[in-house]
Amino acid sequence: AHLDGLSDPSGYLAQLRELLGPNAWIVVEKILAVDEALEPTLPVDGSTGYDVLREIGGVLVDPQGESPLTALVESAGVDYQEMPAMLADLKVHAAVHTLASELRRLRRCIAAAAGADHPLLPAAVAALLRHIGRYRCDYPGQAAVLPCALAETHSTTPQLAPGLQLIAAAVARGGEPAVRLQQLCGAVSAKAVEDCMFYRDARLVSLNEVGGEPRRFGVGAAEFHHRAATRARLWPRSMTTLSTHDTKRGEDVRARIGVLSQVPWLWAKFIGHAQAIAPAPDAVTGQFLWQNVFGVWPVSGEVSAALRGRLHTYAEKAIREAAWHTSWHNPNRAFEDDVHGWLDLVLDGPLASELTGLVAHLNSHAESDALAAKLLALTVPGVPDVYQGSELWDDSLVDPDNRRPVDYGTRRVALKALQHPKIRVLAAALRLRRTHPESFLGGAYHPVFAAGPAADHVVAFRRGDDILVAVTRWTVRLQQTGWDHTVLPLPDGSWTDALTGFTASGHTPAVELFADLPVVLLVRDNA
């Protein structure tokens, strides 16, 4: 369960820590805003890793794709600059309609605590929630969030001042009104963001992930390194993850979709052609679903009955969650039938072979990003979690798709053979963590910078003194330009790649370093 749904998260965790003892590993499922840090007073080891998931996926996104992909989604009639306003309206709708019973109960609590009621009190609560950009804001380190939100709400809607004053008076005393306001805040955020907005934003859907912020087009290397170093210092035992039971897409599906940031012109051409041949019932819905179809499309082009069923199930869930033309509470069967018919046309018509060709063209780049993400998740500061089935390529979408039974027999065979690149990375990194625990759990994080024309295509860092990790990114552009004398300066000593056995020292050419795989896991010899 999410931490923020509890009435007293801090008190609960204090009791849990006392019960389990000082050495028990406790991490909390907490969705952090981009500008929010985990509360340092909580007696836990960290979060379950949605924050790290955003950082890893984001650092592999090509920023050059932002403008053309924004233009593409706006060609479908969306003003992308209005997305924040849309999200704010969704929060109000969630409070007033979806969670109306909770809002009524909160109103009664506030009125009782403040000793007065007002007709505008429910509207004031809903408007206030528009301005709280996180799931919960009553942790000690966030004491300034609520008064700032009250000020912003008063500034934009001064007519709600009487209701806002009642809220402030009731919440200041703590107790049930304060608790229920925070619980409603988290529920409203979940309904508006995860359960609706993430199904409307069709710019680059790999960014529409739990803990994500799609309006930020990826994560720069500076931000990535700073957040990793901070985690090493403050939360070295926090969890890192790429896939969970709640992620909107599996890690490898996100990696493939993320490649579209590198080829926006190619994707725009495909979408334009697709819309001419098989126009979607709604252009934005079509762009959203096309990215997901691309993300799970088999390299062979052979769409099994199982995949067809999974895609139809996903499409129906997606359009109901988006709640533009249909919804769970008010299904529009005609629109849903049109979407299912369109999807069958996509799967069976001439576009299927074109999509197969596009997937084949980009698959090596998708696999490169997937390997990079996996190695980063296993080696950045924190304790890595490997979600069920993600040891090999995984084509899962949202639940229940990501909760299918795992074929452990196939994975046991792959682990023994160590031929699959993903399980090679996984096995090597986990073995290294076991033999060098001081480098990972206690070791510092130090960025390492490549030098040369293609330096931006490398993300590298040291863990402790004896482990160096480097991954490749933006490989479509890299394929065109080549490494062009780019080097990675290795610290003193001789280094061996735990994945390939390649040995290097000093200023090592990137073309040699990444000759076999797009990632390296270097260990200092005799360490």
Tell where the protein language model's regions lie, with residue ranges.
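Conserved short loop/turn motifs at secondary-structure junctions
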Residues: A1-L6
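Carbohydrate-interacting/catalytic domains
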Residues: D8-Y80, L87, H93-L99, A113-P119, ...
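Short polybasic/polar patches that bind polyanions
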Residues: R130
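Acidic/aromatic/glycine-rich contiguous surface patches that form carbohydrate-binding/processing clefts
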Residues: G133
